Curated annotation (Swiss-Prot):
The keyword Transferase applies. Its EC number is 2.4.1.182. Condensation of UDP-2,3-diacylglucosamine and 2,3-diacylglucosamine-1-phosphate to form lipid A disaccharide, a precursor of lipid A, a phosphorylated glycolipid that anchors the lipopolysaccharide to the outer membrane of the cell. Pathway: Bacterial outer membrane biogenesis; LPS lipid A biosynthesis. It comes from the Bacteria. HAMAP family: LpxB. Keywords: Glycosyltransferase, Lipid A biosynthesis, Lipid biosynthesis, Lipid metabolism, Transferase. NCBIfam families: lpxB (TIGR00215). This is Lipid-A-disaccharide synthase. It is an enzyme of class 2 (transferase). InterPro entries: Glyco_trans_19. Signal peptide: none annotated.
Length: 392
């Protein structure tokens, strides 16, 4: 008697932001290489996951909500999508649920799934920043997450200390992209030319750009008034171009606006220094070897909350990974033209600040190494192992 073929392994993935969509797509690609036609994907994702064959439950743009007031206004819709997504997981009964970033949404789904079907293994790809604030989340996650895939090398130890679920460092996706971040010989000459390229990165969301662009422009104006010569480039994405152009209209010095990811990377490869809003971009700049000054401004309510919640000495991701505060940060009321301009002058010249950053950035390859395996491969290995093991 012939035995029937093994049923397909079903994996349910949830990614509600573009960065998570890219991670999900890379993970799906490796899982398909491992399982061939024996895998079926369901879930929520964006355009890149769709290219790997995912039919999303709803467009992720429905959750592109920024700002406290907007979130409150859209709360009934958000809660409905959480319920509907959890119901879809429970109906599918997958061999694994992989939640990717966006913890305010994905963790609520995971908790509902675990409460109603504890047999479904749950993997969390991208740790919440519990090492920075609300550390108690680690123990809470123990109740509904079986394994965390960390992007940062210090995260497994943080989970161990905080009593959270098992966490493995799989590597940041940026380490798979070093070739596009680092200059060739000709680009290195441009990076070291007499007229240095200064990058300005005011944020990747409209609200972030509006919080930073005016003060950044004023700081650059001061720098120019002091006689400092530089070429200014401002990388952004197509959907943010109008916001950027509106913001720089009153700038005393006009930047060249660079549109798109490939063009941004080309600008990174020739840049001498940067002024950036704190975020993932600081790690991108550091891996590219670009000394920087960082700033961070938010609304008054958010600032009030963050001041009482933050438990790390620096909010700069690159500083946290390096383990040393080499990059200056100007937060909230310290984010002023008067303070930013002198710091920018230092990173544009051969100063101690600039040299310290360059030396620290040279250590990142070793600090962030994942051996000879790509992050997406390591992530897929753990998802498959968790599926085989089932619920602990």
């Amino acid at each position: 008697m012939m035995q029937g073929r093994d049923p397909k392994r079903k994996i349910f993935l949830i990614a509600t932001e573009e960065s998570g969509d890219r991670l999900g797509s890379a993970l799906m690609k490796v899982l398909r290489q491992r399982l061939g036609d024996g895998v079926q994907f369901e879930g929520v994702g964006g355009r890149t996951m769709a290219r790997e064959g995912l039919e999303t439950l709803f467009p992720i743009e429905e959750l592109s909500i920024v700002g406290f007031a907007a979130v409150v206004q859209q709360l009934p819709k958000i809660l409905r999508l959480i319920r509907e997504t959890a119901d879809a997981v429970l109906e599918a009964v997958p061999d694994a649920l992989v939640i990717i970033d966006s913890p305010d949404f994905t963790h609520r789904v995971a908790r509902r799934v675990r409460a109603r079907n504890p047999a479904i293994p749950i993997v969390d790809y991208v740790s919440p920043q519990l090492w920075a604030w609300r550390p108690g989340r680690a123990r809470t996650m123990l109740g509904y997450v079986d394994h965390v895939l960390g992007l940062l090398p210090f995260e497994p130890e943080e989970y161990r200390k905080l009593g959270g679920p098992p966490c493995s460092y799989v590597g940041h996706p940026l380490i798979e992209q070093l070739g596009s971040l680092r200059p060739n010989a000709e680009e290195q000459k441009r990076r070291n030319s007499e007229l240095p390229v200064l990058l300005v990165l005011p944020g990747s969301r409209r609200s972030e750009i509006r919080h930073h662009i005016e003060v950044f422009g004023a700081a650059l104006g001061r720098l120019q008034a002091e006689g400092r010569a530089f070429e200014l480039m401002l990388p952004t994405m197509p959907h943010l171009e109008a916001t950027v152009r509106e913001g720089i209209a009153s700038w005393p010095v006009k930047p060249q606006i660079v549109i798109g990811e490939a063009e941004k990377r080309a600008a990174f490869r020739i840049a001498h220094a940067a002024l950036a809003k704190s975020g993932t971009v600081t790690l991108e700049l550091a891996l590219s070897g670009i000394p920087m000054v960082t700033a961070y401004r938010v609304g008054a309510i958010e600032a009030f909350i963050l001041r009482r919640a933050i438990r790390v000495s620096s909010v700069i991701l690159a500083n946290l990974v390096i383990g040393e505060d080499v990059i200056p940060e100007f937060l909230q009321e310290d984010c002023t033209p008067e303070k930013l301009a002198p710091a920018l002058s230092e990173v544009l010249t051969d100063s101690d600040m600039r040299r310290r950053q360059v030396e620290a950035f040279a250590r990142l390859d070793t600090i962030m190494s994942t051996g000879n395996k790509a992050p997406s491969v390591l992530a897929a290995d753990i998802v498959l192992a968790t599926m085989r093991k089932g619920r602990r």
